[in-house]
Amino acid sequence: MKKNPKILTKDLLAEIDNLVEDIQIKGVLSQKQKINSIFAENVIPLLFEIKTSVEIENFSQNDLREKINFCLANTSDIVDIDSEYAPFYSRIRVLRENILLRISGR
């Protein structure tokens, strides 16, 4: 019997919610306008789109992969500006892996 490493949808959705919440809290505390605008304009909206797509299970693998990769690339740019944001990059990388596992086990 082959065991599928499928990530539970509710855990994935909770991780997205926690990540967005932590990004928003960090934004309020840090007051770094350029970084906050990158998160607010590029990363957070895509994370919510990903969450909605996973929640209703209405997505194409390529679309979801493209969105999470774009989030990762933007967060990498943020880390280049300020390495203090490296934990968010790591969390989005883990989220990316979990999403890829989730969609491959669909």
Predicted regions located by residue number:
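Short, charged, amphipathic alpha-helical segments
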Residues: Q33-P45, N62-N69, S90
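Residue-level detector of alpha-helical secondary structure
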Residues: T9-L13, D17-V20, Q24, I44, ...
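Amphipathic alpha-helical binding modules
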Residues: E66-R106
